[in-house]
Structures are given as structure tokens and as C-alpha cells.
Amino acid sequence: VTTSTQTPAPPKSGFNLRTPWNSAPRAARWGVVALCAAVAYLLPNMNVPLLTTQGTDWPTLLFTISVYVLLALGLNVVVGFAGLLDLGYVGFFAVGAYSVALLTSPNSDFGLEWPWLTAVFVAIVATMISGVILGWPTLRLRGDYLAIVTLGFAEIIRVLASDPESIFKGDRGISEIPHPAPFLKDSDGNPIFGVTDARPYYWLGLTLVIIIILGVKNLDRSRVGRAWVAIREDEDAAEAMGVPTFRFKLWAFAIGAAVGGLSGALFAGTQGFINSASFELLFSILILAGVVMGGSGNLPGAILGGVLIAYIPERLRGIRTPEWLPGNLGNQDLFEWRYLLFGMVIILIMIFRPQGLIPSRRRSLELKEREKEVIVGE
């Protein structure tokens, strides 16, 4: 009796941007990256009519986008690379912001009045330590149980910050937080990081985004990144193969927390004032939605997701509904409906593009394998 096996044909796929990109010479790829970076730095000085609407401060919006991208990159390390569902990421954002506020503001109960730059390093260390403290007893949990614990962490931070008798001063908040690098002056002797021009803050945020991208990309290619992938795909199998899963999950939590703390420090130094209303749970959900929408586990996807969740609501500002709509629907600012419209966009993306707008190659393969399992099960 003879048996024959037939190798199944590889699945067909449409156009993939990765193929021409990976086959291009290295110098050409670096040239494209440098060109994109140059355009990004020039964006505040560009008047692009289709990108802005009436009432939108373009440089301020760009700075907001840079903060959201930083947060998306940090959460992508936890959710996308290591596969740990974190619903309380805004807690680390708050720890970083309040660390800077307490150490630098003259209105702080500490009264230290440190320089902003010095306080940033302390804020990063503080958030990294808070990530380790949270992760050490909880990272043995998985899935929904871990998500509930992280959600509780964010609520604890919010409740503490809402107490008017605490050092965080509740809704009164902490004011007079110094701006970054007050020693830098322009030709007229005015501080570069002032209150009227948001461009320097955007350039600072963009520089931090580039630094974090380079750092996370190197981590993804290292032994740590390979361990994260193994944990995300099958933690039990990874542990059976000798991967110290708990240690690498703790690394992911600490690194993600540090990036969140850096984002909070940048936010506090730019706003000059923070209170408990700045760190609601909805913020965590938005960042998580951006990571999933852009493409979990992929740096370009996380960047795109961060851009979209910051840009889409602001793009609606100043656009009004037609007057002929019935009832109170006519002549309404679409900005008031931003969460409804943004939710509809997310639903459509998850229906037609469940792997995200720019999925990682690994994520695409995982979804294909799951589709095959569903077909076989049927």
C-alpha cells in the first residue's frame, strides 16, 4: 500500500507593503525614514487645510498626538508584545505626572522645587518601581483576572488623586508646574518652552517618540523580545521550554510603566497644572483601543493607533451637522459626538480588519491559524 501526501499550497494574500520594503536596499529604507522624520519635524510649520478645522490649534494638536503615541508605544509593549491585558495603564501615566508635579511645583506639599529635567528621571524610576510592585504579586494571573487587577490599580490611583486632603489635592490639583528647560531662551530672551507656542513641546515629544521607537525596536529583536513573543503565543509551552516567563512579563510591565511615566511627566510639564480629572479610566480604554485598532504587537500599528485616537476627535471640532436634520440633531458640533463616531470607527475596523490597520506579521499568522481552526471545527 502506498500513501502519498500533498503539501498544501500557501495561502494567497494581497499586496503586502512589507515585501517591497524589506527587499529595498538598506540605504533607501534609511532615506525614507529620515525623510519621514524631517516631515514630522516640519509639520507644525505647515498649513495643511484638509488636516485641520476651525478652532483647532495645529501645533497643540500635534503635541497631543505625540503624547498619545508615547502611551500607545508603552502599552503596546505590555499588550502587543507580551500579551498581557492591561486596562489600568492610565495609572502609570498619573504616577509620572504627579511625581513631576510634587517634585517641581512650589504649590506642592513637598516644597522641593526641583528642575523639571531632574524630576523626569525620578518620575520614570517611580513608575517603573510601581510597575514592578503591581506586577510582582499579580503577573501569575492571566487574561481577564489580570485585566481586573490592573483596572483596580487605576481606580486606586484615581481615588487617591481625588482626595482633596491628600498631597494630590483632588480637583484643585497642583499648579505652577515648571515647563521643560526654562534656561533655554530665544533671541528676544523669552523662554523657548513658554505658554504661547506649542511647537517646542511637540518637537520635544517627537524626539522622545523616536527614542522610544528605537529602544523598543531593539528590545523586540533581542532575546527579551523573542521571549515576549513566546509568552504571548503560548505561555505554558514557553515555560516548558525553559523561558523564565514571570521575569520577562515583569520586564514588560516595568518597561511599559516607564514609558507611561515619561508621557505623564511630559504632559505635566507642558500643561503646568494637573488634577484628578486628567486621569480617568476612559483614557486607558482609548489608548488600548488605539493599540488594537492600529495593530497590536507592531510598532507602526501602535504609532498609527496613537495618532488616530488623538486626531479623529479633534478633526471633528468645528464641523457642524446639516441644519435640515430633525429635532436637536441639526447644526450641532460633531465634536460633541466624538465618542459615538469614534466608537463606530473602531467597530468597523474590528469587523473588516480585526488584525488592525497595520498588523504585525506574527499577528497576521496567528489570526490565519485561528481561522483554520474554526473552519476545521465546523
Q: Where is each model-derived feature located?
A:
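Transmembrane alpha-helices and adjacent helix-loop boundaries
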Residues: 2-378
